[in-house]
Amino acid sequence: MPLSGTPAPNKKRKSSKLIMELTGGGQESSGLNLGKKISVPRDVMLEELSLLTNRGSKMFKLRQMRVEKFIYENHPDVFSDSSMDHFQKFLPTVGGQLGTAGQGFSYSKGSSGGQAGGSSSAGQYGSGQQHHHQGSGSGSGGAGGPGSQTGRGGDAGTTGVGETGTGDQAGGEGKHITVFKTYISPWEKAMGVDPHQKVELGIDLLAYGAKAELPQYKSFNRTAMPYGGYEKASKRMTFQMPKFDLGPLLSEPLVLYNQNLSNRPSFNRTPIPWLSSGEPVDYNVDIGIPLDGETEEL
């Protein structure tokens, strides 16, 4: 407590009061308002990308256009009336007709001139399979299965699913083959593949056609030419080393060192004390050091 003046305020009581107010308010209400959590839906993001108002949306649109160049979808509009002209050359030569309502083409074979048979298709996209129907009977054609229609001679491209047809020829049996091929690649178009031949339905592009022999090209790679050309290089080397006189061999004098260690002088310096007078003093220094490095004291 200070000696003079007003006493210091109680800070601890003030802070506890503030904490009580915060905790009391939290119990009464649902909680503190910390703001709204950021959430951006996917639709809002795509909408911003489609506005083309900033650089990012423009780059996204250009990327979509580049990607669409390399994407080919199996869309039913591929087999429209305008695109059927490109597939006419792939039809069989006998009794073939390309359908416009379904995805597929069919043809009929028989042993006599008159032909009659049913037709079918594989729905919207087709299945890429072959169906062989063979039967005998009288009449122009028959229909079987749910959702079937009456077959007509040589027609194809009907929209019935699971339709089969039977027919009869004058004095022989009829054979109806339907080939569903919803996609013909540009490679097959360029090579002139006939889809009615079963052998050519699956094509190995690596084994297609005869492999031509590689042409014998001349090599223009530079190689090192010997000095004087190849004519001189083919001859044997006639160069010989010249003879020269090395002279007599002089022997070096052999130097023999004295191996007696006891006769070697000692250059170890000994301390000389201060002299008190001018009288000469003789000091006898014992230099009889044993040759052995270890002594009895050690």
Swiss-Prot record:
Residues 118-129 have a biased composition (Low complexity). One of its GO terms (biological process) is negative regulation of transcription by RNA polymerase II. InterPro entries: MYOZ. It is found in: Nucleus; Cell projection, Pseudopodium. Residues 136-172 have a biased composition (Gly residues). The modification Phosphoserine is found at residue 82. It holds the Pfam family Calsarcin. It comes from the Eukaryota. The keyword Phosphoprotein applies. GO terms for molecular function: actinin binding; FATZ binding; molecular condensate scaffold activity; protein serine/threonine phosphatase inhibitor activity. Its main location: nucleus. Residues 1-34, 105-173 are annotated as: Disordered. Keywords: Cell projection, Nucleus, Phosphoprotein. The keyword Transmembrane does not apply. One of its GO terms (cellular component) is nucleus. Interacts with ACTN2, ACTN3, FLNA, FLNB, FLNC, LDB3, PPP3CA and TCAP. Interacts via its C-terminal region with MYOT. Belongs to the myozenin family. Myozenins may serve as intracellular binding proteins involved in linking Z-disk proteins such as alpha-actinin, gamma-filamin, TCAP/telethonin, LDB3/ZASP and localizing calcineurin signaling to the sarcomere. Plays an important role in the modulation of calcineurin signaling. May play a role in myofibrillogenesis. This is Myozenin-1. It comes from Sus scrofa.
